[in-house]
Amino acid sequence: MHRFYHPEQISSPCKIILTEEASNHLARVLRLKVQEPVSIFNGDEYDYHGIIQSIDKRKVTINIETKTLNICNPKIHISLLQSVTSKEKIDMIFQKSTELGISSLQLIDSERSNFRIPDHKIDSRLEHLRKVVISACEQSGRSRIPTINNRIISFSDIEKSSENVLKFILDPQAHQSLGKVEFNKIENIMNILLLIGPEGGFTNSEIIIANKLGFQSINLGKRVLRTETASLAMLSAMHMLFGDFV
């Protein structure tokens, strides 16, 4: 069943009018017809099921009949602090991490970031990324949309979080690998924070600051991974240990 995002509150039963963008996709790209079933989500915990009532040039009306609790939302809250990199890589990281079950996404400027987003383009860039994650939610079946901070923070803006948050910073030179972490001694982990550097990695001073904020330095083996590979590998590993892959 095809899924569509609707940015407004939904009750069940009710009638809704899809956005112009969603209406165009339904009618002109997918070429769905009146009376075909569809599923709608709006960012809450539910999927709303209905049928297409009418299709006009720029407006599609859906008759919502029932709702069900979404079973694809992530079980644990994983936040990704991702150093700014190229547009294509950031798009892929946000898309794939949404599919894998990320809950929160934050872009950070680090000393070795070789890409910068001009101030006058930040709002449009973040709006584009929000569309990327919504599309990934449509594809993957989840209904909760990952939060995206409305600004890009500097490394010094990273705040110390509560003690019950498991925090990792990836460092190829770290003495401890992910496989050596004594996870059997960690209980009731529901919040995880991942700090991923740019192509050139974090500087020593940044790693020291992160360690003081409670981040454990770890590596992912002998091979040096690209920033987009490292982000998705860590997210997958966390879900294997604590989340949706268990």
What name fits each language-model region?
Residues 162-208, 215-218:
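Active-site/ligand-binding-proximal alpha/beta "capping" segment
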Residues 204-246:
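Structured adenosyl-cofactor binding patch, chiefly the S-adenosyl-L-methionine
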Residues 9, 67, 110-112, 222:
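Short, ordered loop/turn segments at secondary-structure junctions
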